[in-house]
Regions:
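Helix-turn-helix repeat elements of alpha-solenoid scaffolds
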Residues: 5, 33-43, 71-85, 106-119
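Intrinsically disordered, low-complexity terminal regions enriched in Ser/Thr/Pro/Gly
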Residues: 8-9, 13-75, 284-576
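Generic helix N-cap/helix-start motif at coil->alpha-helix transitions
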Residues: 60-65, 83, 93-101, 127-134, ...
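A cross-family detector of function-defining hotspots
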Residues: 185-242, 246-313
Length: 576
C-alpha cells in the first residue's frame, strides 16, 4: 500500500527559541526530515491519479505494482545518526522529557536498532509512566517479543486516563460497520467490552504457532508511533492530523519512501509513503465477533481486496490461505477434530521478480525448524487445546476435546522461508447420547493395501487437501459412534456425483441432447459392532473416468428404527 498527500497544503511554521534545549532538538528534528527527502528514490512521472481510497488529505492505493523497499542511502543514515547524537545529549539535560524520549526510540527503530530502542525506553527517567510503558511495548514488538510487548502495553493502558485508554483499546478504524456496531453496543459495560475485545484479538492473531499476539501488539505499537510523530515534523511536509492517525492505526507506519519532481528536477512535487508490500487484513468481520463459532474459513481469511487494515507479521509476511481438510469425529460427549496442513506455494507478486525481497530474508530465523499445529480455542474461556509437530510442514494432526463451541486453526510455518499457511474457522459440536448413531465427516486419504483399523492409524495417509488428479485412486474414511448397544444391521451407501456442471452441459441435459451424468453408487450391509465403541471404516475408490471438475462424495447410513445419517465431502479433480 502507498499513500500521498492529495494536494499541497500550507503548514504552520513553529517559532523556536534557539536558546531552549528542547527547541534546539525540535529544530534539528525538523531539519533532518526536511533534508532526508533529497535522498528518497526519485520516480518519473506524476504521482497523481485514481485513488483506491481518500482519507482526509491523503490519496491511497493498494496495488503498488513492483515497488519494494530499497536500502536507505548512506547519506540519510548519517543524517539520522547526527540527529540521534544530538537528541541523546539533550536528553541528558532533560531526562524526563517524553517528547525527546519518543523521538530517540522512533529514530532508533527506523535504523532497525531495536535493542537500543528498548534500552532507551527502559531508562525513561521521570517521563510519564504510561508513556514509558508504551515505548517499551513498541520496542519489544519490534524485537518480536510479543508476550512481553503485550504486558508492557497492558501497563500503559492501565496508567492512561479513561478517555485515551478507550481510544487506544477500541479499534474503530480497523473493523467493518458490523464490528463497530457490536462494539458500540457494549461500550458502556466494561465486562462485555473486555469479552468482545478478547474475541476480536483472538480471531485477529495471525498464527497461534507463534507465542503472543502480534496483531494486537502491532495495534498499540501503531498508536505509540502516532503519538511520537504527532508532535514532530514528517516527510510529507504537513502537520500531523486525524487522517495520519487513521492511516497509521489501520495500515502501520511507512517502510519506504519515494519522491516525484517537476519536469526540471528542481523541486519535489510529492512524497510517497509506502507500507509493507505483503500487508493483509487479519481483523475479523463484525459478524464473527458475537458468534465466533459460526465463522467460516472465508470470514477469517487474511486476504481481501479492499482491506480496512493491513499488517504483515515479521516472522511470516507471506501468510497464505491453506485449504486443507477438516473433519469432525463425534464420540458421545467428546469430539475428535482432524486437520490437514501443508505449506502453500508462494504465488505473491514479487516471488518471480529479479530483485531483492528483503522481507523474505531468513535473518535470525535461518536454521529454525519448520512447524505445524492444530489449535482449538474454547469459547467458554477454557484454555486453548493444541497438538503440534516440529520439522514438518505437511501432514495431519488430531485432537480430542469436550463437545462445545470452538475456533479451530490449522497452521503451518516455515521460519526460514518466512512463509506460513492457515485455515481458521469456527465450529460447534453438541454432545450425542451414547446410544444414538452419529456419523462423522468424511476424510479423504491416499489408498493403502493395508487398511487401517483405527482413525489414528489412518491419519498419516490423509490427503493434504480434498483434491486429486484425473485417474488418481483415493480412499475415504469415516467413523460411526453410538452403536453396539443392540444387535442391528447397518446399510452403507456411497455415491460420487459431479457438482457445478457447466451451463452448456445443463442445457444439453434439459433438452435431452446429452445424457445426464449418473452418480456412481456403491452399497453394502454389515452387522453392527457387538460392543459399544466407535466403528471405523475405510474404503478405496478407484474412479479412473472422473474428468476435471468438482465432485461430492456422499455417505448415507441406514439402520432400522433410526433416522438416516448423512455425511458428504466436496472435492476437486485436476488435470494431470
Amino acid at each position: 500500500m502507498a499513500q500521498i498527500v492529495s494536494r499541497e497544503i500550507d503548514t504552520v511554521a513553529a517559532v523556536i527559541d534557539s536558546s531552549d534545549s528542547q527547541g534546539i532538538a525540535r529544530t534539528a528534528q525538523a531539519r533532518f526530515e526536511r533534508r532526508r527527502i533529497r535522498y528518497f528514490p526519485l520516480i518519473l512521472g506524476s504521482a497523481s491519479g485514481a485513488c483506491d481510497e481518500r482519507v482526509g488529505r491523503f490519496c491511497s492505493w493498494y496495488d503498488e505494482g513492483d515497488w519494494y523497499p530499497r536500502p536507505e542511502l548512506v547519506q540519510a543514515e548519517e543524517l539520522r545518526e547526527e540527529l540521534l547524537v544530538l537528541l541523546d545529549s539533550i536528553q541528558a539535560l532533560l531526562p524526563g522529557d517524553g517528547w525527546l524520549l519518543g523521538q530517540r526510540v522512533w529514530y532508533l527503530s527506523e535504523a532497525r536498532r531495536w535493542e537500543e530502542a528498548l534500552e532507551v525506553a527502559r531508562s525513561c527517567g521521570t517521563a510519564e509512566p504510561w508513556w514509558c510503558a508504551a515505548l517499551e511495548g513498541f520496542s519489544l514488538h519490534g524485537l518480536q517479543r510479543y508476550v512481553e510487548a503485550d504486558q508492557a502495553f497492558s501497563i500503559a493502558i492501565d496508567r492512561m486516563d479513561n478517555e485515551q485508554s478507550l481510544r487506544w483499546r477500541v479499534p474503530r478504524w480497523v473493523i467493518d460497520d458490523d464490528g463497530k456496531n457490536a462494539l458500540k453496543k457494549v461500550e458502556t459495560s466494561s465486562e462485555s467490552l473486555d469479552n468482545l475485545l478478547e474475541h476480536l484479538w483472538m480471531l485477529a492473531d495471525p498464527l497461534y504457532l507463534v507465542e503472543g499476539n502480534d496483531r494486537k501488539t502491532s495495534h498499540y505499537a501503531r498508536w505509540t508511533v502516532a503519538k511520537i510523530r504527532k508532535e514532530a515534523k514528517n516527510p510529507y511536509r504537513i502537520s500531523w492530523g486525524n487522517d495520519l492517525d487513521e492511516l497509521t492505526i489501520r495500515h502501520g507506519w511507512e517502510l519506504g519512501w519515494d519522491r516525484t519532481s517537476d519536469v526540471g528536477f528542481t523541486t519535489v512535487e510529492h512524497v510517497i509513503g509506502h507500507k509493507h508490500p505483503e500487508g493483509r487484513d487479519y481483523m475479523p468481520p463484525g459478524k464473527a465477533l458475537t458468534t465466533p463459532s459460526l465463522a467460516t474459513p472465508e470470514d477469517l481469511r487474511a486476504d481481501v481486496e479492499r482491506p480496512r487494515s493491513l499488517y504483515a507479521p515479521a516472522y511470516a509476511p507471506v501468510l497464505l490461505p491453506m485449504e486443507g481438510q477438516v473433519a469432525l469425529f463425534p464420540r458421545g460427549s467428546r469430539v475428535v477434530v482432524v486437520g490437514t496442513h501443508f505449506l502453500p506455494e508462494d504465488t505473491t507478486r514479487h516471488v518471480g521478480h529479479n530483485h531483492p525481497i528483503p522481507w523474505l530474508d531468513p535473518g535470525t530465523q535461518d536454521g529454525m525448524l519448520d512447524r505445524a499445529g492444530i489449535f482449538l480455542v474454547p469459547l467458554d474461556g477454557a484454555r486453548i487445546k493444541s497438538a503440534q509437530r516440529i520439522g514438518h510442514t505437511e501432514g495431519a494432526l488430531s485432537i480430542e476435546v469436550p463437545s462445545g463451541s470452538y475456533v479451530l486453526s490449522t497452521e503451518t510455518w516455515s521460519p526460514s522461508k518466512r512463509r506460513a499457511g492457515r485455515l481458521r474457522m469456527g465450529f460447534e459440536s453438541r454432545p450425542v447420547p451414547e446410544d444414538v448413531a452419529s456419523l462423522s465427516d468424511i476424510l479423504m486419504l491416499r489408498p493403502s493395501s493395508e487398511e487401517p483399523e483405527l482413525l489414528e492409524a489412518a491419519l498419516p495417509q490423509a490427503l493434504k487437501q480434498a483434491e486429486i488428479l484425473t485417474g488418481q485412486t483415493f480412499a475415504i474414511a469415516w467413523e460411526v459412534s453410538g452403536l453396539g448397544f443392540r444387535s442391528e444391521t447397518l446399510l452403507f451407501e456411497v455415491s460420487v456425483s459431479q457438482i457445478n456442471r457447466g451451463v452448456l452441459r445443463q442445457i444439453g441435459e434439459f433438452l435431452r441432447i446429452t445424457k445426464p451424468t449418473r452418480p456412481l453408487r456403491l452399497s453394502w450391509e454389515e452387522p453392527g459392532p457387538p460392543n459399544p465403541s466407535p466403528l471405523f471404516r475405510y474404503l478405496n475408490l478407484d474412479l479412473p473416468n472422473l474428468k476435471a471438475g468438482k465432485y461430492e462424495v456422499r455417505l448415507v447410513l441406514k439402520t432400522v428404527g433410526r433416522a438416516d445419517a448423512v455425511s458428504a465431502r466436496v472435492f476437486s479433480v485436476q488435470e494431470r
